[in-house]
Regions:
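Phosphate/dinucleotide-binding and metal-coordinating scaffold of catalytic cores
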Residues: 1-116
């Protein structure tokens, strides 16, 4: 299982998870949902307490990935499998992306706290 923090305008909005079977889930943090001034990260992922599930990477996140020759270069330079969409996402959107959303890999200490 791999997890990443999803930030909206540099504030942590929720957690994106890739499960061992390759499926994905996304959940907003409770405090994000409770705060009326915070908006959804996407129209396709409306702000709610429920967890979203998908067999594939959610289209919102998939559309943040590089394509074509850019994808080839990024994968080669970072030694990422071309089919590893989660790895590609956290590599290419950790510092900068088009729009207000960035995605950052959670380190082992954060995973222990989150699962503890």
């Amino acid at each position: 299982m791999r997890k990443a923090k999803v930030l909206f305008k540099n504030e942590e909005a929720g957690i994106l998870t890739q499960h061992d079977d390759g499926s994905f889930s996304f959940r907003y943090h409770d405090d994000w949902v409770a705060n009326k001034s915070k908006q959804s990260i996407s129209l396709t992922l409306p702000k709610t307490e429920k967890e979203f599930h998908s067999k594939y990477l959610f289209p919102f996140f998939y559309n943040m990935l590089p394509e074509g020759s850019n994808k080839q270069v990024v994968c080669k330079l970072n030694r990422i499998d071309r089919e590893d969409y989660f790895g590609l996402l956290i590599t290419t959107t950790r510092n900068d992306s088009i729009g207000a959303v960035t995605v950052r890999k959670m380190d082992n200490a954060q995973l222990i706290i989150d699962n503890g």
